[in-house]
């Protein structure tokens, strides 16, 4: 909750950007705007750095986004996305990114060692303590290293080069995982609320019930700032976000069942229908959330957007297995087990805060090939599965032109192009 005030400041910047785009009726890519909001938050969480990329370009953000555009966009066909220059471009951009993040690491190490030396010499400012301020991931990593290597607290040279490299790589992972998936969730939620006005109506009513009727984004932000836990009262909005993540899970996890340490020698996968077990020692297991989320035993009418399915007292599917012991692992956009996403609570919180402030202010309409997407049907064209037809371009998946594509994580096709309208003018 200590990050809530910072999230609110960034949220209001996002809201104002949306207002400007609504007033100009500009065609823009929502996912790119949401990305800058999300990466500003994770920059603060990871390194206690203010990127402020919603206001002006930041070198780390620009280099990071460049890195993502250089990643392959297919994971199966090796020649489908062939680019002979890519390895060299990635090498150069990686060096640049490592240098930029390395400077942030060095800045923090310098500050810590200077403070520790001043305290040792009796010249420290007691009012400024690393223990008193917000703890970033970088802070926590340095704390752990200093505990194992006490000399590093006062001597910068005591930090090993190997530790620094690992720390830079870890920070890159946190920044990547902490922004790309959240921005896609925000974009898809705003897209789906336009397609389902009955769901939007209930979200708006819930926001009114918690923060007051006809509150502005600034008033809602003030309410959350004074009572941060009030955001947890938005149970229906939370269900909306969960349903969005069910339909459009941004990532999944590959589990390597290595034989090297013998830990996987008794690992089996069991066919639930036949009960037959198969050894998978030495294989990689890939639990694909997108497929699991369409299992009708847990999620009836799986391609439909029905947030109520996550509210046990209101679910239209009381016979589904979702709320049984067997269903506890059915919803898995952040994966499960020891390799699950450690930032899932942060991701859900920043999504709730932003959406609570923005959805009553503006309405987003996706627009593909000059066509506004105002309605949805599960299968819209004969080419629903067009990638199986040579030379045919896929137009929709499950009726969505904003289907997911591989761009770092799973992001909306075309970065979700569309236009905004002020709800006060609708």
Where are the model-predicted features located?
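Cytochrome P450 heme-thiolate monooxygenase catalytic core
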Residues: 2-186, 202, 207, 221-224, ...
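Cytochrome P450 I-helix active-site segment
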Residues: 60-65, 121, 195-251, 281, ...
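Short, small-residue alpha-helix embedded
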Residues: 181-194, 354
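Cytochrome P450 heme-binding "Cys pocket" and the immediately downstream C-terminal segment
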Residues: 197-199, 327, 344-405
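Hydrophobic, well-ordered secondary-structure elements that form the walls
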Residues: 203, 244, 282, 305, ...
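Cytochrome P450 C-terminal beta-domain/meander region
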Residues: 224-243, 254-286, 301, 306
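Conserved cytochrome P450 K-helix/beta-meander segment immediately N-terminal to the heme-binding cysteine loop
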Residues: 287-322
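C-terminal helix/juxtamembrane-tail motif
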Residues: 411-426
């Amino acid at each position: 909750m200590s990050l809530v005030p910072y999230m609110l400041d960034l949220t209001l910047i996002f809201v104002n950007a949306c207002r400007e785009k609504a007033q100009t009726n500009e065609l823009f890519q929502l996912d790119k705007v949401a990305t800058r909001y999300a990466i500003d938050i994770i920059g603060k969480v990871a390194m206690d750095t203010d990127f402020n990329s919603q206001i002006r370009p930041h070198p780390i953000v620009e280099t990071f986004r460049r890195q993502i555009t250089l990643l392959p966009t297919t994971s199966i066909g090796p020649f489908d996305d062939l680019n002979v220059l890519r390895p060299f471009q990635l090498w150069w951009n990686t060096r640049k990114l490592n240098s930029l993040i390395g400077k942030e690491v060095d800045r923090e190490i310098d500050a810590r060692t200077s403070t520790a030396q001043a305290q040792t010499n009796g010249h420290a400012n007691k009012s400024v303590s690393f223990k008193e301020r917000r703890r970033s991931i970088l802070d926590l990593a340095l704390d752990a290293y200093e505990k194992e290597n006490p000399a590093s607290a006062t001597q910068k040279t005591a930090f090993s080069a190997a530790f620094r490299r690992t720390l830079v790589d870890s920070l890159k992972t946190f920044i990547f995982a902490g922004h790309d998936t959240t921005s896609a969730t925000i974009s898809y939620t705003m897209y789906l609320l336009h397609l389902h006005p009955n769901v939007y109506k209930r979200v708006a009513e819930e926001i009114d019930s918690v923060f007051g009727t006809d509150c502005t984004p600034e008033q809602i932000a003030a309410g959350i700032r004074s009572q941060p836990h009030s955001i947890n009262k938005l149970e229906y909005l939370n269900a909306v976000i969960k349903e969005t993540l069910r339909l459009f899970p941004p990532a999944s996890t590959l589990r390597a069942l290595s034989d090297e340490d013998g830990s996987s020698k008794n690992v089996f996968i069991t066919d639930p229908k036949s009960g037959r077990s198969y050894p998978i020692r030495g294989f990689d297991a890939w639990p694909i959330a997108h497929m699991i989320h369409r299992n009708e035993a847990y999620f009836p009418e799986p391609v439909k957007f029905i947030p109520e399915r996550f509210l046990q007292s209101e679910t239209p599917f009381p016979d589904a297995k979702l709320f049984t012991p067997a269903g506890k692992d059915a919803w898995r956009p952040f994966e499960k087990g020891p390799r699950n996403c450690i930032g899932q609570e942060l991701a859900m919180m920043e999504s709730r805060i932003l959406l609570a402030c923005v959805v009553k202010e503006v309405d987003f309409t996706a627009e593909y090939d000059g066509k506004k997407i105002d309605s949805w049907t599960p299968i819209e064209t004969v080419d629903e599965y067009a990638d199986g037809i040579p030379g045919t371009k896929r137009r929709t998946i499950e009726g969505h032109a904003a289907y997911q594509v591989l761009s770092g994580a799973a992001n909306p096709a075309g970065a979700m192009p569309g236009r905004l309208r002020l709800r006060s003018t609708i």
